[in-house]
Amino acid sequence: MQLAKVLGTVVSTSKTPNLTGVKLLLVQFLDTKGQPLERYEVAGDVVGAGLNEWVLVARGSAARKERGNGDRPLDAMVVGIIDTVNVASGSLYNKRDDGR
């Protein structure tokens, strides 16, 4: 899994039928210091994540296993909303504080 921040939603009115009803989010991956990387992904969302929230993103076959998504063409899935991230040097992220 990887840490990412939700940048927004992706709306697609014309898509493969097995993606109907799947909420899509634009996420930006974060490094080990919580800084944004220049890597983005469109990910399915099964947890109801919102704008600017830090999330856990599963990729590849792990993403497709979540909630029976095996037949959906999903390479990435938001599988968790992060409350806190703590490292040896202290708190990296706290949702209550809305950032660092």
Curated annotation (Swiss-Prot):
Protein's GO biological process: carbon fixation; photosynthesis
Subcellular location: Carboxysome
Ranges of residues in domain BMV: 1-83
Molecular function GO terms recorded: structural constituent of carboxysome shell
CDD domains per UniProt: EutN_CcmL
PROSITE patterns in alphabetical order: BMV
Signal peptide: none
Function: Probably forms vertices in the carboxysome, a polyhedral inclusion where RuBisCO (ribulose bisphosphate carboxylase, rbcL-rbcS) is sequestered. Has been modeled to induce curvature upon insertion into an otherwise flat hexagonal molecular layer of CcmK subunits.
Protein name, entry field: Carboxysome shell vertex protein CcmL
Originating organism: Synechocystis sp. (strain ATCC 27184 / PCC 6803 / Kazusa)
